Amino acid sequence: MQCSTPIPPGYAFCGVCGTPRSRSESAAQAPEPAREAGALALIDDLGNESVRYPLQAGENRLGRGHDCEIAFASDGLLAGVHCVLSAAEQPFRLRPLDMHNGTYLRISTPVELHHGDIIRVGQEVLRFERIEELQAETSPVTGRKLTVGCAMPRGVWGRVCQIGMGRQVANAYLLSHRDVFLGRERGDILFPKDGFVSGSHAVISERGGRVYLKDLGSSNGTFLRVKREITLRNSDLLLLGRNLLRVHVGAA
């Protein structure tokens, strides 16, 4: 016989008479599953999507830490919390947190370069510098600026520094042509030993005092380090440590 004792949430039967909870009541008590706002797809060595990571409708932490919503525990190039992707609403927003190895976005159209911007071409990490913004060294004794080395050649408007181990400058390339080409086989700045760099990979151009970076249809793409919060579009490609991820906006 069914009594009128209310059944507490989470219980399947009445503790007094043993009557089971009705299906309609059970359905009303069931928590709603977390809404999937989109996903990140890991790109494998063949360029195919492999693992798919759902994005919750809110903030999603990415990094090496186990408390991240999307964790890559074995990637030593990532910080505990490397960046945060907000999928609360469209467009999605990405906020970088790591100050060492950085978060990169693959460029699909020409982008303007600014002093200090970091570029990834293949395995190469390159820092762009404007000549007029380079600071001369300062004497530790007098505090005055020092002029080190030879005077800068006429017509030079920029410099690209190749960053090596320990974040030290391995090579420096002066930019004086309006278009400076980067590649493995053809161009002004070559990386012949980097198999991830295309024969002709990218170009840095100076136009009217402004500088632009353009990918030349390379196989593996050209990436620019994200310095501040940005918006993301569907199919954008992110590079975090050793992980290449494609953004999918909206539930599958």
Q: What are these model-predicted stretches?
A:
Residues Y53-V121, A172-R242:
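Forkhead-associated
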